[in-house]
Every structure is written in structure tokens, then in C-alpha cells.
Amino acid sequence: MSPHPRNIKLLFALILLLLVYIARQKRFEQQYFDRYLEHPRGGDSTKSKFQTEVDKWVKCMEKDLYVDRESWYYVRFATERCKNASIFLNVPIMKLETNVEYQTGIRSYDMFIATKKEPFVFVTIGNYTDSRTRKNMTDELPTDLKTYGTHLNSSNIYWDYGSLANYLNQSESAGIGHFSTYLKTQVNHKVIDLISIKEEVNNYKIFHEISRMGKLDENGQIVCQIEIRLAPPTSQTIKHLMAGLSLIFNDSRYVLLSFHNLELFLVNYEHQECRGKYLAPYI
């Protein structure tokens, strides 16, 4: 006996309701997860749990900066202490020691947060990482890795490296533009997962370029992780370095998770594209 048409309609209606329920449940779970990141359980619901931790970190760093604003050395120790005093302690930073000596007897590191999530856009500036370390690094990253660089051996493109190197090496008085111009013209991606600058940076206006309302914002580009190697500051440039670091601490965009000798490692917590991929899984 064939099923009654009314029963068939009822069956289809039940299936439709089930599909709607599943879709709404997935949406609810995602909203709950987002709300968990944005709001603490109990307490002041006007401030997110995440922002509370960020504020704690900023206050810690600023307190240490004001101890001695003429000496950047203390910032290195403060970076580790303030990270350990916040939820960012849970974020696993990979530090791969290279065969390259940054200074006599001091090894350079490649620093990044590993992921297998695609897409992954990797920009290298400067050719200071040995091939063994670079292979170990890429083994921790997605197979479909898109790499852009400023030297022939690093990627599928080559740009006027001399121009960019001159910009990074020039003093504070140098005009800005080359760093953001390179990213805009040669890296055709809105989200850049990792930038590794192995050229010694002496132009601290790079901090303004990556900060809010900076040149990267004008480009419409987002950088999730950035490793910057600094040139040793002088008595004339130290105040500019401290001003750049202070801007980063108060800009509500990057958290400084490592300061190894003169190599900084910053992670973007402002944009969801970065926070959800590199910070949220560990918080």
C-alpha cells in the first residue's frame, strides 16, 4: 500500500524542521563561542574577557616603561613578565634557532605561531635564515603556503630590495612609504599571516605604518603576526624606539609576546581574522 499523501507531507515537514533546527544550533554555537570571547562569565558584561586581559597586559607594560623611559633594555624583561601575568601565557610561540648569529655569540630566532589552517600568506624581508631552519618552519605551516620575499631564494617574486632595505635602515627622519608600498604592490592579499623582517630596522616609523590609521590601514591590509629585527639603538634614537613601542602598547592592535635580544614578535588581536586563528584557540 502506497503511503498516504498527508503522511508524505508530514514527513517532509519534519525533515525540514530538523534541518532548520540543525542550522540554528550551529549558528547558536558559533554565537556562543564569539560571545565567550567577547564577554566574561559574570562580572562586568560591558567589557570582554579578552579586553580585560589586554588591559591588564597594557597596564603592566606601561608601568615598566615609565620605570625608565630612557632604557629599552628593561622592556625585554617586562615583555616576558607581563605575558606570564596574563592569559597570553597560554599562546604557544615557536622559536626556531637559526645558524645565523645576530650578534657575536647570539643566535637569531624565527618566531611564529604554528597553524595548519589555510590560507597562509608568509612575507620575508631579508635573507638571514638558513635553509634548515626555514624547512623546519614551513613544516609547521600549511602545505598550500604562499610565500613572498625580497630576495631571489625566498619566493616566487623579486622586488627592488635595495629600496626597501634603505628605508628600513634609515633614521627616524626618513619618509615613510616603502614598507607599506611593498606590501600593497607586491603582496596582493588582504590578510597577511606572517611577516618576518630580518633586515635590521632603524626606522621606527615602521611602528606607525602597522598601527591604527597607518599606511597598512590605508592599504586595507591586515597583518596577523610580525617579527621585527631592530638595529641596536643609539643615545639619539632610543627615545624614538620607546615612542614606537609605547604606540604599539596603547594602540589596541598588537600584543608583544616575545622580545628576544633585538627581535620583536607581535600578534594582532584586534582583527577577528587574526584573533580567531592564532589567539582564540589557546584562550
UniProtKB/Swiss-Prot annotation:
Tree of life domain: Eukaryota
Species of provenance: Caenorhabditis elegans
Protein name per the record: Uncharacterized protein C28H8.7
